[in-house]
Amino acid sequence: MSAEPHHLYSQLPAIDSLLRAPEMAPLLDEYGAALLTENLRLMQAEAREYIRQFHTLADWCADWPAALRHRLNQRQPALKPVFNLSGTVLHTNLGRAPLAESAIAAVTDAMRGAVTLEYSLSGAGRGHRDRAVADLLCELTGAEDACIVNNNAAAVFLMLTVMAAGKQVVVSRGELVEIGGAFRIPDVMRQAGCELVEVGTTNRTHLKDYRQAISEHTGLLMKVHTSNYSIEGFTASVAEQQLAALGHEFAIPTATDLGSGSLVDMTRYGLPAEPMPQQLIAAGVDLVTFSGDKLLGGPQAGIILGKKQWIDQLQQHPLKRVLRADKMTLAALDATLRLYQQPDRLTELLPTMRLLTRPAQDIAESAQRVLAALNGSYAADFTLAVESCWSQIGSGSLPVDRLPSWAVTFTPKDGSGSALEALTVRWRGLAKPIIGRVADGRLWLDLRCLEDEAALLRELAP
């Protein structure tokens, strides 16, 4: 089609007339007039620019409703499901722990309507939003009380603010951790109005170091679990029971930030040991903080357990309202914790435990099936193989421990890194993107977290 540009401009339909067209009715019902109007204005601008450059109408101008629907279908949700084949089970950038079906159902129910978030059915009056979940946590850990906030960083910040603002906090030099996003314990203390007092050395700290640091300005003795790194060799550290006894001797509270935190003995499932909150409560620690979405396998949340006198102060502080968890978080956390009342079924019901304990042989068999299905489609450009590899737990949990796994690897036949880059870019653009990892000149798809082979193969079908 050819015509003068000014003539073509006049052929562009008005937005009002487009919105009144019968073909637009389904789109109006689905998306609303405001969104359609915004997109039609953009399309008009693009059509004018096309006329200016090429002196013709763009092909899509022949059917504006179809072009608009195509455009709207390309809109991406803010959070998009992906296949996590990275080899990191609790991948922070991919949302950490997948929720159990019971937790998903609980969140769905909580979203549908009114719930007893802060309402007491027994007294027909105001209740406390943490109460039901706190009671369950106390049952599972032996703590006197519990407090729930929106993540563990918030839990640590609230704890420091309440227990030690304007005072000194004594911490071993070897426990001044930094986690992802440049979250550093010294920085958090500074923001909470605390003064950090470092004791010991990077690799060795003794009880006498804490004792010598205590003064009339001391507000808290604190331990931080080094969940995302390990110091090995010539080392020494102080057990929580010893530190708690020292704190009681001087009437100074003690606290431990576990970071990850597991409510079950991981060695029971053939996994490396991880400190459990209930062990620290039994050791006499006044407050313990840990995450809900790491080894616990629940939603993002910060959990604080311990002595009721301190939990009461946390609950009454204005900062608690700023950091409190919403009804969806509490519903998911409650449902997740209830699974721990059936420890013999955890690997069946809790996805995090199921993925962490998945037998290597099962993963290897899955890898062989995936290889057989994909080899014909990719053999021209890549050499595909099944190779053993090591998965990691992730999210700063058990940093030096690895889980034996198996992967399908893609090695470019021309040895080109650009071929791998093109493949990963293409897979990230799929309806359900595939996230692997590139190492040693090939792309690795670690299948530990793959539970729907058929869905993966549908995405990768030519």
Swiss-Prot record:
Check the record and name the NCBIfam families matching this protein. Answer: selA (TIGR00474)
Q: Which reaction does it catalyse?
A: L-seryl-tRNA(Sec) + selenophosphate + H(+) = L-selenocysteinyl-tRNA(Sec) + phosphate
Give the UniProt keywords, A-Z.
Cytoplasm, Protein biosynthesis, Pyridoxal phosphate, Selenium, Transferase
Q: Its quaternary structure? A: Homodecamer; pentamer of dimers. Binds only one seryl-tRNA(Sec) per dimer.
In its UniProt entry, the species of origin is given as Yersinia enterocolitica serotype O:8 / biotype 1B (strain NCTC 13174 / 8081)
Question: What name is this protein filed under?
Answer: L-seryl-tRNA(Sec) selenium transferase
List membrane-spanning regions: none
Where does the UniProt annotation locate this protein?
Answer: Cytoplasm
A Gene Ontology biological process noted in the UniProt record is: selenocysteine incorporation
Query: Which domain of life does this protein belong to?
Result: Bacteria
| Gene3D superfamilies reported in the protein's UniProt record | 3.90.1150.180, Type I PLP-dependent aspartate aminotransferase-like (Major domain)
- Enzyme Commission number, as recorded: 2.9.1.1
Q: Which GO terms describe its cellular component?
A: cytoplasm
Q: What is its main location?
A: cytoplasm
Record Pfam families: Se-cys_synth_N, SelA
Modification N6-(pyridoxal phosphate)lysine occurs at: 294
Per its Swiss-Prot or TrEMBL entry, what cofactor is needed?
A: pyridoxal 5'-phosphate
UniProt-recorded Gene Ontology molecular function terms: L-seryl-tRNA(Sec) selenium transferase activity
Q: Quote the pathway field.
A: Aminoacyl-tRNA biosynthesis; selenocysteinyl-tRNA(Sec) biosynthesis; selenocysteinyl-tRNA(Sec) from L-seryl-tRNA(Sec) (bacterial route): step 1/1
Q: Give the family per the record.
A: Belongs to the SelA family.
